[in-house]
Amino acid sequence: MSCTRMIQVLDPRPLTSSVMPVDVAVRLCLAHSPPLKSFLSPYDDFQRRNFVNKLKPLKSCLNIKQEARAQDDWKPSHNQAKKRVVFADSKGLSLTAIHVFSDLPEEPVWDLQFDLLDLNDISSGLKLHEEKNLILDFPQPSADYLSFRNHFQKNSVCLENCSLQERTVTGTVKVKNMSFEKKVQIRITFDSWQSYNDVDCAYMKNVYGGSESDTFSFAIDLPSVIPTKEKIEFCVAYHANGQVFWDNNEGQNYRIVHVQWKPDGVQTQMAAQDCAFHQAPPPKAELESTVFGSPRLASGLFPEWQSWGRMENLASYR
């Protein structure tokens, strides 16, 4: 479009022969709005039509009718009939089983009184049985360390620990390592040495090192019934280098005696006429000299030495 045509659109007044671009700019600035509006009106109509088309609502992708129908299907039906229980006899039919209940008559009080008297007579005739049990009749050999060490050096074998749990006797034996081939046995009797059994001991690995001594363990099951008049004794035999070394508790043997538990909880040993042996007197505390020549009381220095229950926590003796 030329400058002349542009000025005629903006201002219909007659123009001079020559029109410069400056004239067009002046006419644009000074021209009234109606001619400019009439010039831009086609673009406004086009923009208005497109804006209307853009504001049209989109169609929803959700089907509201189907959701409403699904909710109606889940609603509980109130038109269903309620369930009722009807007995067969009400319709003239026979029942499967008939139970008749009646009130129990109350027992008179005087009957209860006689029942209590009978119960009292029965309880008065009952007697608590006295329980008989077995216990060790010797102290733990390792409790007195000095005596244990002297006994071990003298006999080359010594009972170290012993315990009695229910009907099983368990313990350990310490022997000198005199040869590679060796055997340790427990000789035990349950009938006052009319017969005896030799039970082999098992070798225990020395976890503390050292080769001067070895340790053996044993476990002996006692018979279920042992008459109280019979002696239960045992001793230790050690076989090495073609010789046999004995530990018989200085000639007294290691004894297991019967004890009696009274109903009041008192523990007493069986009488001498009922049992063929009596309890040995407790050993007296003696002063013994150590290797350094100073006398010491073993029971005072070692009141709680290693016992069978503490074997896993303390080192073995040398």
Swiss-Prot record:
Protein name in UniProt: Protein phosphatase 1 regulatory subunit 3C
Free-text note regarding domains: The N-terminal region is required for binding to PP1, the central region is required for binding to glycogen and the C-terminal region is required for binding to glycogen phosphorylase, glycogen synthase and phosphorylase kinase.
Listed GO CC annotations: cytosol; protein phosphatase type 1 complex
Job of this protein: Acts as a glycogen-targeting subunit for PP1 and regulates its activity. Activates glycogen synthase, reduces glycogen phosphorylase activity and limits glycogen breakdown. Dramatically increases basal and insulin-stimulated glycogen synthesis upon overexpression in a variety of cell types.
Native species: Bos taurus
Keywords from the UniProt entry: Carbohydrate metabolism, Glycogen metabolism, Ubl conjugation
Keyword Ubl conjugation set for record: yes
Signal peptide positions (record): none
Domain of life according to the entry: Eukaryota
Motif (PP1-binding motif): 84-87
Domain CBM21: 149-257
Entry's transmembrane regions: none
Gene Ontology MF term list: glycogen binding; molecular adaptor activity; protein phosphatase 1 binding; protein phosphatase binding
GO biological process terms, semicolon-separated: glycogen biosynthetic process; glycogen metabolic process; regulation of glycogen biosynthetic process
Assembly mode: Interacts with PPP1CC catalytic subunit of PP1 and associates with glycogen. Forms complexes with glycogen phosphorylase, glycogen synthase and phosphorylase kinase which is necessary for its regulation of PP1 activity. Also interacts with EPM2A/laforin.
Post-translational changes noted in the entry: Ubiquitinated by NHLRC1/malin in a EPM2A/laforin-dependent manner.
Residue ranges of the region described as Interaction with EPM2A: 141-263
